[in-house]
Amino acid sequence: MELAIFLEEVFDPLWKKVKNESTSLWPEESRMQNLPRNKQTLSSSDFGFHNCVKASDGSLTFLDFDYFGWDDPVKLTADFIWHPAMNLNVELEKKWNAAMLKLFSGDPYFEERLNAAMPLYGMRWALIVLNEFLPELAQKRRDADGSKEYDLEKRQKIQFKKATQYCERVKNTDFRFTFA
């Protein structure tokens, strides 16, 4: 399926559905205003095992803080689940979500925001993996790859497949399901 057709026939209709459903489920208390700082957390936004080193004692050191700042803990929770490098099984997803629910239990609307936001983050990641189709970002990847065998067409096919998989996963999401 060509990218333009995918965006028009798959992504856009799904985006409209997800946006409407998520908006209707979003807690009224935070729908039209910024989340107060006391409900935010420091977040690297690219938090995951792909950005850490495991020491000989088993401890983990996180290295990549490019997008570090204050944010809704829902973003940290969702990005950890949706990031393509994570690839968590259902059991680990449940453990992560349960731990995050416990950690942010002082926020009475955290779980509602998480449930409403999870499909939105899936849609976001569907677009992020398509960055390979943007010439300037593809060139950055080519330069960072360092090998002379960088195959743009092959990379685009891989990323396109990931985007379609993200959309399928979002389609199968029950918006009223508690993710924790």
Can you say where each PLM-predicted feature lies in the sequence?
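An alpha-helical support segment within catalytic cores of ATP-dependent transferases
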Residues: 1-45, 56, 110, 172-178
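ATP/Mg2+ or Mg2+-diphosphate-binding catalytic cores
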Residues: 2-5, 9, 127-180
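Short, solvent-exposed segments of well-ordered alpha helices
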Residues: 38, 113-117, 150, 154
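Short, charged/polar micro-motifs that form catalytic or ligand-binding hotspots
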Residues: 67, 86, 116
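Catalytic activation segment of kinase domains across protein kinase-like and atypical kinase folds
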Residues: 50-80
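Short amphipathic alpha-helical segments and their helix-coil junctions
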Residues: 17, 25-28, 62, 94-113
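Short beta-strand segments
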Residues: 42-45, 62-64, 127
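Active-site activation/catalytic loop segments of kinase-like enzymes and analogous catalytic loops
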Residues: 73-108, 119-139
